[in-house]
């Protein structure tokens, strides 16, 4: 499975740097100088390998210099490009109750009472913590509920069973 670790937003300056929107929990490791990332153009075209020459944080994003990208035109041509890695390349997580986003996405969510809530569509990372965006369109009307990914609410996660069990506070599922 391919995981997106960054997206090129725009060129920065005239020397070929690009602004990258971060989509990984460890940008320092993913965008370390010397690393090679697969780049998928947004406008179609062949995938290519890009070698990171340098990366630095800038306003919540990264300014990245790639080997062979030496001017603004070359950098601007990368706008919208996604940097991806294969999930098989990710290291195993040794901490209990810690997951990669892609492991949670698609899992079914049920309450401790057995009520179906939906499936995890996305894991949102906010300043206040992680939220599970749980979507359900079983009754014909698409619905999304944001569930805080905290132990007080998420009582069990079973990757083997494809299930997350929650004990939501009153009103959470009614919002």
Curated annotation (Swiss-Prot):
Q: What is known of its domains?
A: The PRC barrel domain binds ribosomal protein uS19.
The answer to keyword Chaperone applying to this record is yes
Q: Where in the cell is it found?
A: Cytoplasm
Q: Which domain of life is it from?
A: Bacteria
The reply to whether Cell membrane figures as a keyword in the UniProt entry is no
- GO biological process entries: ribosomal small subunit biogenesis; rRNA processing
Family, per entry = Belongs to the RimM family.
Chain's role: An accessory protein needed during the final step in the assembly of 30S ribosomal subunit, possibly for assembly of the head region. Essential for efficient processing of 16S rRNA. May be needed both before and after RbfA during the maturation of 16S rRNA. It has affinity for free ribosomal 30S subunits but not for 70S ribosomes.
For molecular function, the Gene Ontology terms on record are:
ribosome binding
Q: Which UniProt keywords apply?
A: Chaperone, Cytoplasm, Ribosome biogenesis, rRNA processing
* Name this polypeptide is given: Ribosome maturation factor RimM
**What Gene Ontology cellular-component terms does the record carry?**
cytoplasm; ribosome
- What does the record note on quaternary structure? Binds ribosomal protein uS19.
Q: Where is the PRC barrel domain?
A: 96-172
Q: Which InterPro entries match?
A: PRC_barrel-like_sf, PRC_RimM, RimM, RimM_N, RimM_N_sf, Transl_B-barrel_sf
Q: What is its main location?
A: cytoplasm
């Amino acid at each position: 499975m391919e995981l997106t670790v960054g997206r090129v937003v725009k060129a920065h300056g005239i020397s070929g740097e690009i602004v990258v929107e971060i989509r990984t929990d460890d940008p320092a490791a993913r965008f370390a100088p010397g690393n090679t990332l697969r780049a998928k153009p947004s406008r179609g075209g062949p995938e290519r390998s890009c070698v990171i020459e340098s990366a630095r944080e800038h306003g919540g994003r990264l300014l990245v210099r790639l080997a062979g990208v030496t001017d603004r035109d070359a950098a601007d041509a990368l706008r919208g490009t996604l940097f991806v890695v294969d999930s098989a390349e990710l290291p195993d997580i040794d901490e209990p109750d810690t997951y990669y986003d892609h492991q949670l996405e698609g899992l079914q969510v049920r309450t401790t009472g057995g009520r179906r809530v939906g499936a995890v569509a996305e894991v949102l990372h906010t300043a206040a913590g992680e939220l599970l965006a749980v979507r359900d369109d079983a009754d014909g009307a698409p619905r999304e509920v944001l569930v805080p990914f905290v132990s007080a609410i998420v009582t069990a996660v079973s990757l083997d069973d494809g299930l997350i069990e929650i004990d939501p506070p009153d009103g959470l599922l009614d919002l």
